[in-house]
C-alpha cells in the first residue's frame, strides 16, 4: 500500500507511536537523518526505547565511516548527541555498491542486536545509493533481512519511483512517500569529504597503540607466502571473539614486522581487512581491491 503524507512531523509522530521497524530511503540530502531523529525524539518522549541503525558507511552520524552503527536511545536528549555507537559492524568501504553483501549483513545484524537489546522501535537510516542495479539490489536485500513493516521514501521529483515499485511488487509493506526535507542543507562533495575525514580522525583519537599481529588473525585468511608489505596502510576492523567490531585499525609494515595501530586493542581477537588504504596525516582514503592486494590480480 502506498501512502502520501505531506507533513514530516505528522508522519514522525505516527511512526513513533505505532511502528516497530521503519526503513528510511532517499538520495543525498533528502532528510533521512533529520526524519530519523524526529521519529526517535517523539518515540523516546513517549517512553519507548529506540534502536537507531545508521547504515550510511560514507558519513555516519553514529559510528565511524566504513561501519554501520547502532545506538540505543531511551531519552530525547540522547537524540541530539547520538554518538558514540553502542554497537558497530565493519563493512570496510565507503561505497556500499562495492560490497553489497557486507553492507546488507551489517545492517541486518545491528537491527537484530537492537531488538535483542530491548528496542521497541528500530529506525534504519540507509545509504544514499538508491538508483540503478546497485541501489535496487542493496535495498531489496535489506528489506529481505530487516523486514520493516513501514518504509518512508524521501524524494525530489520522482527518483524513488523504481525502488518504490519494486518494494511494492515483492514485499507486503506500507510505503509513505514524502518530499525531501526542505530545511536540510545540501552539502558539497568537499564538505562531505571533510566530514568523512573528521569521522576517521575521531576513530583514531589518542591514546593509540601499536599491536604486533600474526598473519593468522585475519579475515579473509592471508594466502601463504604473501608479502606482508602489501598490507601496509590498509584499514581494518578490530574484532573481539564474539563477532563484534570494537573499532578501526590501520596496518603498518616496517622491518618485516606487521602491526596494527588502534585505540581499541584490548579484547582484540581478529582483524577484518577493509578495501581502503588510509593516510593518517590527511585521513583521506584510497579504494583498493583485496584480490589485487593478496593475489596480484
What name fits each language-model region?
Residues 1-17, 24, 42, 149-297:
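Preference for solvent-exposed, low-hydrophobicity sequence contexts
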Residues 2-25, 46-47, 51-122, 130:
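Nucleotide-state-sensitive switch-loop elements of NTP-binding domains
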Residues 28:
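The conserved Walker
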Residues 32:
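Conserved lysine of the Walker
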Residues 35, 39:
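Hydrophobic positions on the alpha1 helix immediately C-terminal to the Walker A/P-loop
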Residues 41, 57-61, 140-142:
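A generic local secondary-structure boundary/capping motif
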Residues 113-173:
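Phosphate/Mg2+-binding loops and adjacent switch elements
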